Amino acid sequence: MTEIIFEPSIIKRDFNAPMQLVYEAWTLENHLCQWQVPNADVSCMYKSANITTGGCAHHKMRMPSGKEMWLLTQYHELLPYHIIVFTQYESSENGEILPPSMPNWPKEIRATIKLSEANGVTSMEFTWQPINPSEGEAEAWEASRPQHGKGWGGSFELLAGYLAKVRGV
């Protein structure tokens, strides 16, 4: 079988906040639901959150239409305050991993967040990539590439606003 070659999606963003606060916004349950949704009209609720290396978090997002989407996040690496690596899956309310709701969407996508700080500004590099995609999954990934920044980009806008609010700016 031939290995499928593809490029990950990389989003870079600077936040006017210390690196420790940005890291905590990614790793503390009380921060996550304040920003980790595609837009401000979507609500979030955690059922469980063991945000540690090897741990899992389980939450739902509720869309303005009332539709709910459950997500299970498995944490692979947490290096305070520099690196966060996780894989997120669609799941049932009970935490069972479900097939993606989008046709041919990769079953497993890993996110790697790298943080660095200079002069009170935290730079984030967010890398998003499928793990062992089938040919159809790789094609769906590439076809959707222009949209990759929209969902996470909306979340990162909310994160910037939330960090400013927390800092009292």
What does each model-found stretch correspond to?
Residues 1-44:
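Hydrophobic ligand-binding cavity/cleft-lining segments
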Residues 47-48, 64-119, 161:
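Hydrophobic-ligand binding "helix-grip"
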Residues 161-169:
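Short, highly charged C-terminal tails/helix-capping segments
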